[in-house]
């Protein structure tokens, strides 16, 4: 399923002046991303502002993207939350949508469950989903995180086949070593080269909204064994990747996409657009 899929974009959700999903802008953005290296999309994930999307909006958004993209890219729909029952119902609904290839589920935030609780949570989602589940380990946002041992245990489930791992290259390496036939993606753009060199499958990216061509070149260089060129590209990209998280994401990437005419800067509360001073600072970081 993930063979040859290196660059997956965690796509933003654009909004109109009335705070509705801007499907016209989204349609144009999708085509742009497909033409600039994106081989897949995570729909309504963190970058897609999932916490402020209703369940109905998530279903509608997923259907729209799935219909437009069809079989041109891998599509992962986000069903995760800190409520297992709600996640199960979301997985059931989203996995039935045509052209959806997989379901993303995040470690439960705020509740602070044990490892055993998280394992039970993910197994319940996987049991309910009609499509394979990708785990999402991001303790920087959720407080709790899966251990390598828990990931390896979950990888034995017949309907769990991948993880978006944001912790460290060491975690990526250990999961690759311990889980056969299990795709390990980094969720940190700046770890693209290091994660790939230890056996990672690729990157689930925010930066690919703006630097898709360069990231595609990076993967091409690595796949060709041209490590000096890969290193050069990663050195160029890393400060720009980090700059996109200088303020609450996805605000910076939406700001830059708005400058290019793809979307409005709009984000949903409690996120707010960047101030003029913050925009100036962001541009300084991106130009270093």
UniProtKB/Swiss-Prot annotation:
Ligand binding (pyruvate): 47, 204
Active site per UniProt: 136, 164
Signal sequence region: none
GO molecular function: 4-hydroxy-tetrahydrodipicolinate synthase activity
KW Lyase (keyword) present: yes
Catalytic activity: L-aspartate 4-semialdehyde + pyruvate = (2S,4S)-4-hydroxy-2,3,4,5-tetrahydrodipicolinate + H2O + H(+)
Entry GO CC: cytosol
InterPro entries referenced in this protein's UniProt entry, alphabetically: Aldolase_TIM, DapA, DapA-like, Schiff_base-form_aldolases_AS
Site (described: Part of a proton relay during catalysis): 46, 110
Primary residence: cytoplasm
Enzyme Commission no: 4.3.3.7
Family to which the UniProt record says this protein belongs: Belongs to the DapA family.
PANTHER family: 4-HYDROXY-2-OXOGLUTARATE ALDOLASE, MITOCHONDRIAL, DIHYDRODIPICOLINATE SYNTHASE
UniProt name for this protein: 4-hydroxy-tetrahydrodipicolinate synthase
């Amino acid at each position: 399923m993930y063979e040859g899929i290196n660059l997956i974009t965690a796509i933003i959700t654009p909004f109109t002046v009335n705070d509705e999903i801007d499907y016209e802008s989204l349609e144009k953005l999708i085509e742009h991303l497909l033409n600039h290296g994106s081989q897949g999309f995570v729909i309504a994930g963190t970058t897609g502002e999932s916490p402020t999307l209703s369940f109905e909006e998530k279903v509608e958004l997923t259907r729209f993207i799935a219909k437009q993209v069809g079989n041109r890219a891998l599509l992962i729909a986000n069903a995760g939350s800190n409520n297992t029952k709600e996640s199960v119902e979301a997985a059931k609904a989203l996995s039935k949508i045509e052209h959806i290839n997989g379901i993303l589920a995040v470690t439960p935030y705020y509740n602070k469950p044990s490892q055993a609780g998280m394992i039970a949570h993910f197994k319940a989602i996987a049991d309910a989903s009609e499509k394979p589940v990708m785990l999402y380990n991001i303790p920087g946002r959720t407080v709790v995180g899966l251990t390598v041992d828990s990931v390896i245990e979950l990888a034995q489930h017949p309907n769990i086949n991948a993880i978006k791992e944001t912790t460290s290259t060491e975690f990526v390496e250990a999961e690759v070593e311990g889980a056969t036939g299990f795709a390990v993606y980094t969720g940190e753009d700046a770890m693209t080269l290091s994660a790939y060199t230890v056996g990672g499958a690729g990157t689930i990216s925010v930066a690919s909204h703006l630097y898709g061509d360069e990231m595609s070149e990076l993967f091409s260089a690595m796949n060709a064994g041209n490590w000096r060129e890969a290193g050069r590209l990663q050195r160029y990209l890393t400060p720009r990747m980090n700059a996109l998280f200088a303020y609450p994401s996805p605000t910076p990437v939406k700001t830059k996409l708005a400058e290019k005419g793809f979307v409005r800067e709009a984000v949903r509360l409690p996120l707010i657009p960047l101030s003029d001073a913050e925009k100036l600072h962001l541009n300084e970081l991106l130009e270093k």
